[in-house]
Amino acid sequence: VPGKGNGRITIKDATKKFFKLHSESELAKDKAFINFGPQLLKALAASERFQGAYLLNYVDDTDIEREIQFAAIEIDTSDGTPFISYRGTDDRIIGWKEDFNLSYMTVPAEIEAVLYLQDVMSGRKENFRLGGHSKGGHLAIYAASKATQDLAERAVNIYSFDGPGFGFNRDILNSTQFKKIQPRIEKFIPQTSVVGRLLTRTVAPVI
């Protein structure tokens, strides 16, 4: 997937390139808890709704010394409303350490989430949506709460899929900007949710 400012590619074409690089037998050996990702990608590529969506502005920043694990991507859909997607934690220790840190301090991924949103969407006029799973959902809410007023107003929806609430940064929940975006936050958690129930919640979740 192209990085920031380096063009775009459809989900269908990205899937073709991915499976040229990685065989089914190779992927079957992957024991990571997110190893279902390639099969989900294949399903999206076969979907009339999603196969033509464009992927662009991808960033992936993982650094042990800085204690950061951050990734985000813009997805352009047919309705003309870009979706900014923040990735959650994978099975690397550095990501889990950052998760624990966000319970009592501002973490680098939160800062990067704001900078990414402002870098990608500033200077444009269209409305957009943003969201993510687990830590990604937390980052989406944080970014919308801390971005410029113009961006906050253009955020149509903020989605958190089983994302944690706020600990150290729970003062955000009392900020004027958060209160303005709060009606546009939609949080979803499974019945067996653990992470999505942690820390101070932002809105009542849909189970």
Annotate each predicted stretch with a short phrase.
Residues 140-149:
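Short glycine-enriched nucleophile-adjacent loop
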Residues 131-136, 140:
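Gly/Ala-rich beta-loop-alpha elbow adjacent to hydrolase catalytic centers
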Residues 1-82, 86-103, 107-127, 148-207:
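Alpha/beta hydrolase fold serine-hydrolase catalytic domain that processes acyl esters and thioesters
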